[in-house]
Regions:
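Conserved catalytic SET/PR domain of SAM-dependent protein methyltransferases, capturing the structural core
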Residues: 1-153, 161, 168-174, 179-289
Length: 289
């Protein structure tokens, strides 16, 4: 029986996980395998092949991004480590664009089930641009409801109507939609991806700067807690309680890098940059006082 449930909440993610019962410290709450893995083999394919996407324009952009990322990394390594513990912003922007290209290409080859799970997650960025791969949701009119859940491409922006021109697959019909009804495939990936990939349940946990859970790979868990847990599938991760959790309490995760944990302003800056929200967790609010 599940120890938690998913509820709608006010906030950037719109949903959250809540304990259905008292959960003791160190209890395993979730065991989950990513429905989409962004592993090293995947990265090598795009980094090492001359034409990884088969699209000359995208392949040229990938090669250019690789060069620029290398330059940014060299600049960062030459700095005093006390200058900035986080990844340089100029490199992060380039990596985000690289992730957008790769995630969209991978999405197109995934099963319908994986695509539906992908687009069910939150998009904090909604960086809708021409030829961006998107999902449609939240339409309430009788005609609009027929488009909910469809995968489409943005073909431009109609300034007179203040709507995006959207072309649905496989039907070439074009419709005009508001930004609030669009999710970008790459934006969902950037908003939810962990090292192991995208998770259907784990990605619905909201952030706290003092979270009550932590997620580990099975080998990490066994080493840290001297256990002999056997993974059900490769890349399986487990989420455990870091403290005693009361029934009805929200389960929270830590979204940002360890180096950002020094003070509230640094944490909030990284959360704004990566996830587009202002953290109002209890830990941050107490630190402001």
């Amino acid at each position: 029986m599940s120890k938690f449930e998913i509820r709608e909440v006010d906030g950037p993610n719109n949903v959250g996980l809540f304990a259905l019962e008292d959960i003791s410290k160190y209890t395993i709450i979730i065991r989950e395998t990513p429905f989409y893995s962004f592993g090293m083999e995947n990265i090598r394919h795009y980094m090492m092949n001359a034409n990884p996407t088969g699209n000359p324009v995208l392949d040229a952009e990938i090669r250019e991004l690789q060069t620029k990322i290398g330059v940014a990394n060299k600049k960062y390594k030459q700095r005093d480590s006390s200058f900035n513990e986080r990844y340089p912003s100029e490199a992060r922007i380039l990596l985000d664009r690289m992730a957008a290209i790769i995630s969209e290409k991978d999405f197109e080859s995934e099963s319908k089930d994986v695509q539906e799970k992908w687009l069910a997650l939150h998009d904090a960025h909604q960086d809708v641009r021409k030829d961006t791969l998107i999902g449609i949701f939240g339409l309430t009119s009788e005609k609009g409801k027929l488009f909910n859940g469809k995968i489409a491409y943005c073909r431009g922006f109609d300034k007179s109507k203040e709507r995006y021109v959207v072309e649905c697959n496989p039907n070439p019909e074009k419709v005009l939609l508001k930004k609030e009804n669009l999710k970008t495939v790459s934006g969902v990936f950037r908003s939810n991806s962990y090292t192991e990939g995208l998770f259907e349940t784990r990605c619905r946990m909201n952030h706290s700067c003092k979270p009550n859970t932590e997620t580990l790979s099975v080998p990490q868990y066994n080493e840290l807690y001297e256990k002999t847990l056997v993974a059900n599938l490769p890349n399986e991760c487990i989420t455990i309680a870091k403290e005693d959790i009361k029934a009805g309490e929200e389960l929270t995760a830590y979204y940002i890098s360890i180096g950002a944990g020094k003070n509230v302003s640094i944490r909030r800056e990284e959360l704004r940059e990566k996830y587009r929200f202002e953290c109002q967790c209890e830990y941050c609010c107490n630190e402001e006082i």
